[in-house]
Amino acid sequence: MSSAKRPIEPLSGGTLVLGALAIGMANFMMVLDTTIANVAVPTISGNLGVAPDQGTWVLTSFSISLAIGLPLTGWLAQRFGQVKLFLSAVVLFVLASVCCGLAPNLTSLLVFRVFQGAVCGPLAPLSQALLVAIFPPARRTTALVVWSMTTFLGPVCGPILGGYLTDNISWPWIFYINVPVGIFILLTLGQVLNGRDNPTRKLPVDVVGLLLLMVAVGSLQILLDKGQDLDWFSAAPIRILAVITVLGFASLITWELTAQHPILDLRLFKERNYAIGTLSVSLGFALYFASLVLVPLWLQTEMGYTATWAGIATAPLGIAGVVLAPFIGRLMQHTDARVLASMAFICWIGASLWRMYFETNLDIQFIGWNSVLMGAGTAFLFTPLVAISLSRLPPEKIPAALGLQNALRMTGASFAVSLGPAFWDHRARQHQVDLAERMTPFDHWSAQAQDNLNNLGLSAQGALESLARTIDRQAHMLALNDFSLASAWLFCAVLAIVWLARSPKAKAK
């Protein structure tokens, strides 16, 4: 073991403020890149000459490589030091962002997005760990609140900033925007944490575990992304991917439970609160993220919104979270964390049930207020569930626990990016068939609609084409209603899971 640097100790005054701001902005930068591209997918797809469903790989590739890179954080931090790793990740992330903006085609963009996701893996867990380290022990709940607020700011700024840059400048600027933020982080932390780091030691890397993780997660992600296009298990490639996925995860779990230095410390799940907290935050965030991707896509492809207006309509998702986050720390002092976590899912259930009644003629204010309620749930998600997860773990296990939890959370988000649009498209096709079957000369509604269109000067063929577009729009609206109902039921299930945890304030026996 070697350590020539001073340990990371609590800061105070202006130094603490600057350090917390820079560390929080690094987490914000990472979260921003998971949401800023959401509203830009249709534009990126069009400019690069690919279909919108192919364009969603811009989101998927980042999320899946991030999920694979996250578990390496614990090993890398012990090998190179938390501060050195953190600053290196920022440098590489900025470099990857520039490369993404310069990408001439979808293939190169996806390669750079994979690189971007992999190198920013340490930012989320290390931003948590460093914030906890620089705050005095009595104010460590404040550190988690700061981290949560920067996480909420991503959904607030991402859609608006992404929409504005896409509509008014060009889509590469959604990546170039990371450059000044990264420079500020490097300059600030280079001064605030100069000469400070944790002790380092050489550890063998779990190469087998890493390869199994890449195979298992990668094959599952490809299966989910391509399943809809290939008609799922009727296609041989999907069946082969399913077998690889099952064998990959079975081998990964078996290996990691017996490895001396596992890349994923699955033994952490023996602690009940950690298992329940991690499962709850992963499932909850996945469902939330699916909505975060699907609603802007619906607004642009079916409702005629520009990227900017789609961003404005969904930006309130994070406003309530930012406003409520400072109060969560105070509530945590005298309220059961399970109660606060339950509030997240209650808000999401209410917002999902409300969204079931969306229609194609609703205005942007209606969508915005629904987003406020959806966003309020985010304020109650992270801090209580992280507190539940870590409440019974020894301090030396916390970095690995945070890395694994963030990995599973982002893996769930990447799966949601694939499954959400696939479910939406599948239900839309079913509704299209049902609605089209009613378009007969004997159906009063279709006959009257066609007569009205003919009276407006449309030919018979033009009237039929107009009705077909209306059916397509209504089918996708009904499909979004179906997605909202399914989300509400799943949120109810996760709400029940939260209460299987022990109260963090109860003493461990």
Regions found by a protein language model. Give the residues of each.
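Hydrophobic transmembrane architecture of multi-pass small-molecule transporters
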Residues: 2, 9, 184, 404, ...
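C-terminal membrane-cytosol helix-exit motif in multi-pass small-molecule transporters
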Residues: 180-198, 214-226, 244-258, 495-502
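Hydrophobic/small/kink-forming positions within alpha-helical transmembrane segments
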Residues: 67-68, 98, 152, 156, ...
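Helix-loop-helix hairpins in multi-pass membrane proteins, especially solute transporters
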Residues: 70-209, 235
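Transmembrane core module of solute transporters
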Residues: 14-78, 83-86, 107-110, 170, ...
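Transmembrane alpha-helical cores of Major Facilitator Superfamily
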Residues: 28, 60-64, 91, 145-149, ...
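Cytoplasmic loop-to-transmembrane helix junctions
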Residues: 54, 139-146, 397-404
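Small-residue-rich alpha-helical segments with characteristic i,i+4
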Residues: 155-159, 291, 367-446
